[in-house]
Amino acid sequence: MIKVENIEVWGWEHAIRGMRNPMNSWDKSDSYPAVYCGKCGIVEREGVCQPKEHDCTPYECYALGPNDLSLMQKLFNGGTEHRKYLRQIIVSLDITAPLYWWKEFDTYKVGTVANSCSTMHKIQAKEFVMEDFSHEHLLGEIDDGLIDQDSPLGVLRTTVAMLNNMRDAYLQNPNKLHWWQMIQLLPSSYNKRRTVTMSYENVFTILRQREGHKLDEWRNLCEILKGLPNVKEIGGLT
């Protein structure tokens, strides 16, 4: 399971300006701040959608002109040494995913920053429930939602119950022994939230390396990343 929320993308204006520095070609730039709400079917150079019956301010974007897009594509195909502008376009997003996936994401340390919810400090903050864990592939569900206790899904439910027992014990007597029981018993399927900031270069690296990955989480994230502004156009993706 993976959930992605609160996506923000910025940096287009300065990235494009810097992209044109080597050839002093700023006068050829044809991109501009705009608004695209998805209802009007247009992008207005003035940043105001028509008609004006609805508020479009949450849909601010940066409209790429054909000149800038063509140069972006050319530099993109030239390789990482030529497409430095990608490292100046920034995306931030909140990702909730299981610990087993985060271990793989930590491969991408260069050019990324992640701030996570703290397991060390807050593991006891709320009751554990099955929805806190990624278990969509576990076997064991019987008709009408019943669970076979000897199945993988049943083992997870037993583990969740034990985690709650240790949590209750810790809340009644907050000593480190009970805390250790939760920390060391916590399965790698536990879903953890992080706020991640990275560049478009990181985005394209992930797409190249993970799009066909065996984990659903990677494939789902890749589909979301391909939906970021202008990613498909710049990279020639489908």
Regions found by a protein language model. Give the residues of each.
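Family-specific signature for flavin-dependent thymidylate synthase
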Residues: 1-238
